[in-house]
Amino acid sequence: MASSLGVLFAFLSVLHVVVSHGASPAQMYWESKLPNTPMPKSIQEFLPEADYSAQGGSKLFLASGGVLKSKTFSYKHAGTEEELAASSNADIFFFEHQLIPGTKLKVQFSNTISKAKFLPANVAKSMPMSSKDLPQILARLAINPASAASKVVSQTINDCETPSVSGEPELCAASLEQMVDFSLKKLGNQIQVKSTEVEKVDRAVQEYTIQEGVERFAGSKTVACHAKNFAYPMFMCHAAATTRAYSVPLVGANGSKVNAVVACHTNTARWNPRNLAFQMLKVSPGSTPICHFLPEDHIIFGSSN
């Protein structure tokens, strides 16, 4: 499906971009709202160019083409037999007590960051994001309603509309400004922001060893923003008071180094009882904290208080 979507999206461009050496509006917004918070490399990859002008009248195009395909999972969904079989050779989920130096985990860190950029704030605000507006959304994106691309868009919109299983506040953000505003509203202005950084991408599953220096870096409140599959960068951000975030240094069997971010969910009682995590770890909902690494294109905001 990815290749067919790529052919479609390669012809689309949301903005006529004029290269400039200045800071983009999104970057300036970050610096004004979070002046003492370094911007993670993963967010920098999504920043639009410094100068741009919208083209195409009422038609909305893509930021820079390409299919945005991220490795993610949903707490709301049951894991299929196919997913379980495909995940059997990697430690996608693990326990919090394993976060100690010397622990070995089989992990795949694949670079899922796309060349597509965040929408400008005004464009993101103007884009509808509800199932009832699906025909309008597909029309603005020039997507055939019968295509595979339409199914991707429809599924993500549905995910954005479906209430959180735990009642946590959620927002689907298509601009950096939306992501920052949501995080500030939920956490206050004393914030740390981190994402996984991989020194050398090895797309194969390999064994990584946890090194000295594991640290819990956020307070009791976090906002996690997970990249979704969509026609342009879209992040599902959710506020949580039951997630512990860790910075975990790793070294792979091939010598590659990773500064990984780990999220440990302490309350899984309301997750789908057939969720892939429960099947892989052979535990029941709510019985124990469940942890996972964050892909490179996922971000965690944490209160530093």
Which positions does each model-derived feature cover?
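Intrinsic-disorder-preferring feature that marks N-terminal prepro/targeting segments
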Residues: 1-178, 196
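Folded, disulfide-stabilized extracellular/luminal domains of secretory-pathway proteins
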Residues: 123, 127-128, 132-305
